[in-house]
Amino acid sequence: MANTLVGRKRIRKFFGKIREVAEMPNLIEVQKASYDQFLMVDEPEGGRPDEGLQSVFKSVFPISDFSSTALLEFVKYTFEAPKYDVDECRQRGITFAAPLKVTLRLIVFDVDPDTGAKSVKDIKEQDVYMGDMPLMTENGTFIVNGTERVIVSQMHRSPGVFFDHDKGKTHSSGKLLFAARIIPYRGSWLDVEFDAKDIVYARIDRKRKIPVTSLLFALGLDGEEILSTFYNRITYARDGRDWRVPYDAERLKGFKATTDLIDADSGEVVLEAGKKLTARAARQIAEKGTKALRATDEDLVGQYIAEDMVNYKTGEIYAEAGDEISEKLLKGLSDVGIEEIPVLDIDHVNVGPYIRNTLAVDKNSAREGALFDIYRVMRPGEPPTLDTAEAMFHSLFFDAERYDLSAVGRVKMNMRLDLDAPDTMRTLRREDMLAVVKALVDLRDGKGEIDDIDHLGNRRVRSVGELMENQYRLGLLRMERAIKERMSSVDIDTVMPQDLINAKPAAAAVREFFGSSQLSQFMDQTNPLSEVTHKRRLSALGPGGLTRERAGFEVRDVHPTHYGRICPIETPEGPNIGLINSLATFARVNKYGFIETPFRRVRGGVVTDEVVYLSAMEEAKYYVAQASAAMDAERRLTEDLVVCRRAGEVIVVAPDRVDLMDVSPKQLVSVAAALIPFLENDDANRALMGSNMQRQAVPLVRADAPFVGTGMEAVVARDSGAAIAARRAGVIDQVDATRIVIRATEETDPTKPGVDIYRLQKFQRSNQSTCITQKPLVRVGEVVKKGDIIADGPSTEFGELALGRNVLVAFMPWNGYNFEDSILLSERIVKDDVFTSIHIEEFEVMARDTKLGPEEITRDIPNVSEEALKNLDEAGIVYIGAEVHAGDILVGKITPKGESPMTPEEKLLRAIFGEKASDVRDTSLRVPPGVTGTIVEVRVFNRHGVDKDERAQAIEREEIERLAKDRDDEQAILDRNTYARLADVLVGQSPVAGPKGFKKDTLLTREVLADYPRSQWWQFAVVDDRMMTEIEAMQKQYDESKKRLEQRFLDKVEKLQRGDELPPGVMKMVKVFVAVKRKIQPGDKMAGRHGNKGVVSRIVPIEDMPFLEDGTHADIVLNPLGVPSRMNVGQILETHLGWAAAGLGRQVAQAVDAYLRNQDAQPLREQMSRIYSPSELEGLSDRELAEVGNNLRRGVPMATPVFNGAKEADIEAMLEMAGLDRSGQSTLYDGRTGEPFDRKVTVGYIYMLKLHHLVDDKIHARSIGPYSLVTQQPLGGKAQFGGQRFGEMEVWALEAYGAAYTLQEMLTVKSDDVAGRTKVYEAIVRGDDTFEAGIPESFNVLVKEMRSLGLNVELISSKRAANDQLEAPPEAAE
């Protein structure tokens, strides 16, 4: 550990007992590998293999026109460099993509009108631009329109053939109806199924079913062939009055005789009636020499004839294949002298008559009728002809354009049906269909097993590359139609490939996929862990997948094959449970899309270090031991019986039968679950909540790695890209808050610059508005190796994930303030900013060109006081660093308001005399309610050709200065390195020539060289040719590097000065970023890592909190009743171990202080070696040891890996070493009375997270605001600045109190009575406090809805009704 840079700063004590052999793969490999394989940007030697983008082009091209006189071929594709880099795309709100250029070849043929022979007339090649292809960033994300998105991998049913039954649900008798389904990667599905009468049917694409024999007829078989394919035949030969039937021991074993079995030759009884023929007896009968048995006419009746019985002379058909033999038929056959009758071997026990019965009910008996039937099912209403029917049937399953099993489908099919087709055979064959029907019939006969569709051998993962490939193929196919039409309509001799191609459909398909596909998601960027988990997510939803509503329990359930592949713990709560999963830590996806997990080989009971990755199908054959199986020093399995897994069962076997062993105990859980210490002591439901809530932890102002971790923290920080790792080994040259400059020392490849500049992100906004800020960990002069962490990012500390803070917890009730999971906090936590986080809100405003004239961003706003403009600069944009509150102006903007459009003359007069104020309204960007903060960044975007204002120019100048500084620093290091190398070459030489004033043959020393300016050193010439070429090469390389540097700088400046690409109609856009500091307050949600969540109920003054004997106050008080029923005891063990860690930290701190006083490192070394193993400390100098010790003052960090961590005894040992009570409990004193509590209390350090559910984002108030247009009721929700709904139950409450007038107000003038609202306003203005409520608008809406149902409802007010009564004529009144 001590050999890494961070390891020299802080060491984690490791409790794991099991050595891990396999290297954990990079956590975002799933994304990166998949997309790289799809794009294949760098063309390998010998051209690209046929996969990814290459295969898409290969499958669509060549395209020929309808008359086949021209052919458009695909040659190759290349990517150009992307126009903007990742950061520029993020800032400008555009997509990070590279232009795709495709080389196409157009071949025009001459067709001889007489012979039809073709000859090449013309060949044209050209590069065609085919739109931009989004590129993946280093961290496995895509930048689409300036936001980071992730493409989630999809789990779907693997192509291939599946056998299943309906579990007895279809038929009332509960009979199992078997079915087979052939699922291609794309194309028509074919189902073959039994019905309740045991007839076999086929259906194509879930359409109407047809007898399976019709399908077989369509494949070109006839009835006799069908029967001979599915059944064996037995020939009965006439033997006097009886028949002889050949004796077959295999066929008859297990047969129960109803009559005596008699040997046809000798006449002896070989088996008496009522007895069962065992396998042994059957064998003995054959050994005795029995060749045939005797059979009577009765035995033949009821059997089925195996082939057509025909009189070849007359052509008369006596019986057809499949006919049942009746006594009459048998007599008829005997009469015409037939001596041998071949029958089908159907015994109704081992072999059923299903296919024969299907053949009997099938109306068709030849190919033509069957094809017509299939055509009518697929295209009802169209009259079939033989040609169209044949073509349609061929295109369904045998046309590679329409039907693709994919390599996976073919491999799975071969495995399931024991076929041997090559995996390039992607369509179905006749043999495949026959094999499927045969396997289905065997299932019905009780042979074989049905498939488990939730087995991971039958589900595969489609990652980014493959999803993108399918999408692009769709785009190209749309394009293909257009190309064909264009080829036919233009003069083909004169056009170039460019003219035939419109790349819009392809580009649109890509855009649509990244912009609106269900699997393209807005990246969860709350903290580094949530980024990593989002990229490792597997979703069963999405196009071609399941839907939430239809997914049953089985699909969602944990399956034995998930072990080491999919995490059984991490999945969302709610409707998506089990449909969205997470990849396990060591899992990877193989080329076929199946998830593999690593194992160690075990040979003869000895565990080796050889690691193999196996998919679920391959694993089923082996006995797999657990990683925790006991071994001796020679790695021999020591127990007599080892617990193993095999094919989903857990069994015990002898050590020498074990084949494999898990590589690590944490290989079965996901990254988030592997971050929970003592996971093995938590209930699974709570662990699920714990994994999910860690992803919602907000990065705090001061990160603090957990005292009790699991050792995964560093891995997550590194792979998430939050912490910066050194790209090459080198020496730190410069460090400040915004960048780190490293002078590279490893292989200085002449083409690469000898310096790496790492820009640190400062106060950037994440997708979730949390704050991304990085800070350096290194000092000038430190040596770093490749991969060392040189800067911390959000939620990382010393290169380890740090999602929360270690706080001193006491488990005890406190005045009911921690009832029902509430959390009581000490004021110290607020005062010391323990749980303070920074959130960055982004506000943007656009100045558009309206019909009435352009909007303008300005400081000159009508009717606004100077006070309100105090934070704006002369361009009308807020200053950086200004503190703003709700309602403050961020960007001043005025919009022309038109009574009427102006004539050109009026426009001219306006322009000359500038009468503005009268006809503009204030549409400034203001701070929304509930936001208070500091402006941290302002970005101004101008359209091409629009003059930049002062603010935009100032921002541009700053940016150019920064770029120039980078260039100058890189140049300085380049100079220093190059001239140092040149000096090394020249010193000790006696040049024959040199700069002006140099005497020939003078011996060069460093002093002599120092007399000449460095730029003149190149003029020295030495005799040695080899040395001269070296100097020349050095100079050439130096000049090129210099030129490259300057060019890069100029490119960036040119990009800055160029206008921005804004949406149509927008002249100018300003983005303002406000940083909001959120301290913790009552109502915020907090959680530990064990699913122990709660809401802060009260923040208590420090002096009132319970305190320990040494006067230390607890930071947080949790309710002990939250533990037993939830069964997440991990939090208690974590508290104890954290308590020990803090105690050891105090001891180390004392030793460090003693060392600093008297410079004797021995006591410090002894203290440290009590805690750590010697190997962890070797190679540390005294000064480094003191630095490590200094970083342990607050507590010694420990790692207790999941299923392999500290046991109770280890915790007690640590507590003892720290000089604390072994029980982990302490006497606490009441902060208010100073008296000790009656019983000891569990006190220790627990790691708490502040979650993204902050009360500030939820609290909301409104007096007057927007109303809905239709119902005129106030809108709802904080985002719309809506009101609170006064619902049914609230109405009951007011009714119960009899508060009639309050209720009337609520339902009318405070809600949707439009006239009443204005009256109230007028009354308030007049100072009057009486008003009248009218009819609520929603009542009118209800009336309109009733009218739309055809009920004519009229409203008659009660006064009017009374008047009508009075005015009624007297006779009507009578």
From Swiss-Prot:
Quote the EC number. 2.7.7.6
Alphabetical GO biological process terms: DNA-templated transcription
Q: Which UniProt keywords apply?
A: DNA-directed RNA polymerase, Nucleotidyltransferase, Transcription, Transferase
InterPro entries annotated for this entry? DNA-dir_RNA_pol_bsu_ext_1_sf, DNA-dir_RNA_pol_bsu_external_1, DNA-dir_RNA_pol_su2, DNA-dir_RNAP_su2_dom, DNA-dir_RNAP_su2_hyb_sf, RNA_pol_bsu_bac, RNA_pol_bsu_CS, RNA_pol_bsu_protrusion
Catalytic activity entry: RNA(n) + a ribonucleoside 5'-triphosphate = RNA(n+1) + diphosphate
Q: One GO CC term of this entry? A: DNA-directed RNA polymerase complex
Q: Which GO molecular function, any one, fits this protein according to its record? A: ribonucleoside binding
EC top class, as a word: transferase
Establish whether keyword Transcription is in the entry.
yes
Q: What superkingdom heads the lineage?
A: Bacteria
By its UniProt entry, which HAMAP family does this protein fall under? Answer: RNApol_bact_RpoB
* PANTHER family reported for this sequence: DNA-DIRECTED RNA POLYMERASE I SUBUNIT 2
Q: What does this protein do?
A: DNA-dependent RNA polymerase catalyzes the transcription of DNA into RNA using the four ribonucleoside triphosphates as substrates.
* Complexes and interactors: The RNAP catalytic core consists of 2 alpha, 1 beta, 1 beta' and 1 omega subunit. When a sigma factor is associated with the core the holoenzyme is formed, which can initiate transcription.
Family of the protein in this entry: Belongs to the RNA polymerase beta chain family.
Q: What is this protein called?
A: DNA-directed RNA polymerase subunit beta
